[in-house]
């Protein structure tokens, strides 16, 4: 009787080796099948590589003061927008405000920022690459790159348009050399 129970146990309860091998054998067909990723669908995922970004001179400033690249939407069209702004050393915006919040991420370099209607480049605060700045709607501020800097700053700016830029003092230029 002992022999018979032993043989039934073997049939009902497989050895430990079989328990360990079962999941591996079940997964084997998955590992052997070779699948290639589908080609990217530009209607679903749009990619712009760095060498494809179209930079244009900032119309409100002198040549080589700042450049802008629109990646999505537009500053004067209703809806979301994403732009890149590049400030060169020595140039800053005059105090101004926007009708909507702006969310800004420093991508490279150091951005110098401050709030208020007075323009004092020495009172600006440095925001290095990786830093985040939220510009609250209808609040005056100014920013750019101090002339002592050795490289430009590139900022990714996200928000809702139209931005409706308003200078604190429209009788003065929209930029300053600082």
Would you name each region that the model predicts?
Residues 36-79, 169-178:
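A short, N-terminal "cap"/entry segment at the start of jelly-roll beta-barrel domains
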Residues 128, 138-163:
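Ligand-binding loop in jelly-roll beta-barrel domains
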Residues 88-89, 98-118:
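Glycine- and acidic-residue-biased ligand/ion/polar-headgroup-sensing regions
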Residues 81-97:
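Conserved short histidine dyad/triad with adjacent acidic residue
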């Amino acid at each position: 009787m002992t022999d018979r129970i032993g043989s039934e146990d073997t049939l009902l309860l497989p050895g430990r080796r079989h328990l360990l091998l079962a999941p591996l054998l079940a997964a084997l067909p998955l590992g052997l099948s070779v699948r290639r990723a589908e080609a990217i669908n530009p209607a679903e995922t749009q990619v712009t590589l760095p060498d494809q970004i179209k930079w244009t001179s900032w119309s409100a400033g002198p040549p080589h003061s700042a450049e802008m690249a629109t990646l999505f939407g537009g500053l004067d069209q209703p809806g979301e927008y994403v732009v890149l702004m590049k400030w060169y050393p020595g140039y800053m915006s005059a105090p101004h405000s926007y009708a909507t919040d702006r969310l800004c991420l420093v991508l490279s370099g150091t951005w110098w920022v401050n709030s208020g209607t007075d323009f004092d480049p020495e009172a600006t605060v440095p925001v290095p690459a990786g830093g985040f700045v939220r510009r609250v709607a209808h609040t005056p501020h100014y920013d750019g790159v101090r002339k002592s800097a050795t490289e430009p700053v590139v900022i990714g700016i996200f928000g809702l348009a139209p931005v409706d830029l308003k200078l604190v003092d429209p009788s003065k230029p929209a930029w300053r050399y600082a």
